Amino acid sequence: MAAGFEHILNWRLLAGSHDFPGPDGGTCINEAAIVAAGLPYRAIRASADCPPCFSPPLSAYALGLNDAMPDAERPRLMAFVLRLSGSADVPAVEAERVAFLALASVRRILPPLLDLAGLPTLAAACDGAADSDRARAVARDAAWQGGARAQEASQRGAWRQGARAAAVARAATAAGKAFADARCAAEVAEGAAAFVPEVWASAVAILDEALEIGRRAAPLERALVQRRLDAARSGLA
């Protein structure tokens, strides 16, 4: 991930939407990106609320991570505060981004959860999925096996085993849907994180790589961004 100056911007990220920034920032990553880009502020309740210069699938994935991440993990997203505005591209590129987010989620988010749940063969199949068709098929198998194991564990009173299997079913179901909806790719990480918290780092890396596909945001001067964020914090934006 490219190094930036986000660590000195002193902006707090929160889950949910926010009508206006507070003295410490207090917005989601998409709202913070609006401020940093110098665009008129708006509350973001869904990725459709983002300005048209924001890539829809990348905005949806970032928003999904923002709302699902624990407070201690969410600051990782400030690495993208300058990269969402100007990322919108033609439909073919946006479709490529959706496919990348989904395929990467199957290959990199599901395997550690599947291993933990005692499904190493499925974990290896996810890791080695060569394309979207294979990844969808493996995710479908994982969702079915996770659901079946969760039910069987519940009948035996094996609650922890059942919880892991249920997490597999939830995350794998989201992975299958992610090929049509980028927000569901974030739900893959959310479903796995209860048992494999390190997946947040993987999810952030996936977003970083997805932002390298197609059009990229123009670089901005640090001083200009700092002034915009300071003005928003003080209510002058």
Model-derived features: positions:
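Short, glycine-biased loop/turn motifs at secondary-structure junctions and
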Residues: M1-A237
